[in-house]
Amino acid sequence: MITKFSKIEEVERAERMAADMGAGFLVGVGGGRSIDVAKLASVRVGVPFVSIPTAASHDGICSAQASLTIDGETTSVSAQAPFGIVADTAIISQAPKRLLAAGCGDIISNITAVRDWKLAHRLRGEEYSEYASALSRNDRDDDRRDRLT
């Protein structure tokens, strides 16, 4: 199925198609909209999904969250992380450069947000979650760098 919007109606349409076919897994190919629709539909149908991005513009290609429009408002919905990711660099490299720049910004923002959170925890007693932190970045690599600096 081809999706033009990341709306709950598209998720429901994908669910119906998956149920009618008896699908064992779903595949999201393209950008955020297609991947988010497949991500949420797959969890609602109870099957894994595979993410096949065509641009590296954000971390949604590998996250367990789906951004959807529900009742006219964009919201983040808990779904599931992909069972696998197939990223063809020959295809991704053909995407507009602004999308790659956006993806780099997304990665940097995740790293700095977690560091800000840790600092607020140390200085102000802000509640901190190692689990949530690990979802944002590779904790072990960052902690290794912390010990070296």
What does each model-identified segment do?
Residues 18-41, 45-54:
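A short, small-residue-rich loop immediately preceding and capping a beta-strand
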Residues 5-9, 35-37, 60:
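Short active-site-adjacent helix-start/loop capping segments
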Residues 3-6, 33, 56, 92:
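Glycine-/small-residue-rich active-site loops that bind phosphorylated ligands and cofactors
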Residues 12-15, 35-37, 71-73:
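A generic local structural motif
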